Amino acid sequence: MGGARDVGWVAAGLVLGAGACYCIYRLTRGPRRGGRRLRPSRSAEDLTDGSYDDILNAEQLKKLLYLLESTDDPVITEKALVTLGNNAAFSTNQAIIRELGGIPIVGNKINSLNQSIKEKALNALNNLSVNVENQTKIKIYVPQVCEDVFADPLNSAVQLAGLRLLTNMTVTNDYQHLLSGSVAGLFHLLLLGNGSTKVQVLKLLLNLSENPAMTEGLLSVQVDSSFLSLYDGQVANEILLRALTLFQNINNCLKVEGRLANQIPFAKGSLFFLLYGEECAQKMRALACHHDVDVKEKALAIKPKF
């Protein structure tokens, strides 16, 4: 009898347990509508699922930020940063993430020794930086990003992510002064990098070259003479046109300030000596006969300055 009673209690327990599990299941799945179950409320980790393409709402972003701040799991951290970065591409979410205190949470991740996590954090900050109000909070990371860009592996994804963020942060003149001490390093990177790195560095330098307040600093920087190879006719147009625009912008800024390049004293070996020297003049004359119309026009616009 005792054995039968025990078996009966076990059976009852299994039935009750199954019933409780079913209740929890129904609570999380929600009531049926037309024979179909509602999708359950997603947990923070569910929101990092790569297949989740919806734009997150404020409550979901809050969960995601909490997860990002609290987890030590590198896989979850990386997924959370990717999801956050994707959502930061939308203007509404750029403001929401800032208001939720998300920028410092993301910003702290650029200190990660994990290069992939660091890259994803920089990408997220890059998308967030499109919002002007966000830039006031992101600016504190600019000096570190400048240092890291020069220390990161050459032509790496993390280096390009840092350069993209710096490019976004220098679209206006507000924070360009934060890069004043990094100009020489940018020119060095321009000469060492591959095509993708060269293009991204040139985009950044073009932003700086449009600001008259940065002109003297650009012209005074010491640059290797191999810089002039960027003005060779066989250079890819995406690089050549940007290099020509850089020169054109500097000329325009000098004109705006009512100064001629030769009126400003610069040391030998500076960008000034390269741009306004005879070798560069010869290259401009050669480019004035270039087969590409855009290259030809820019070269002709620069040529009269010699």
From Swiss-Prot:
InterPro entries in UniProt: ARM-like (IPR011989), ARM-rpt_dom (IPR006911), ARM-type_fold (IPR016024), Armcx_regulator (IPR051303)
Subcellular location: Endoplasmic reticulum membrane; Mitochondrion outer membrane
Modified residues (Phosphoserine): S43
Keywords: Endoplasmic reticulum, Growth regulation, Membrane, Mitochondrion, Mitochondrion outer membrane, Phosphoprotein, Transmembrane, Transmembrane helix
PTM annotation (Phosphothreonine): residues: T48
TM helices/strands, residue ranges: 7-29
ARM repeats: 101-143
Bilayer disposition of the protein: Single-pass membrane protein
Gene Ontology CC terms, in alphabetical order: endoplasmic reticulum membrane; mitochondrial outer membrane; mitochondrion
Major localisation: endoplasmic reticulum
Keyword rRNA processing found: no
Function: May play a role in cell survival and cell growth. May suppress the transcriptional activity of p53/TP53.
The protein's assembly and partners: Interacts with the DNA-binding domain of p53/TP53.
Protein name: Armadillo repeat-containing protein 10
Source organism (scientific name): Mus musculus (Mouse)
The gene coding this protein: Armc10
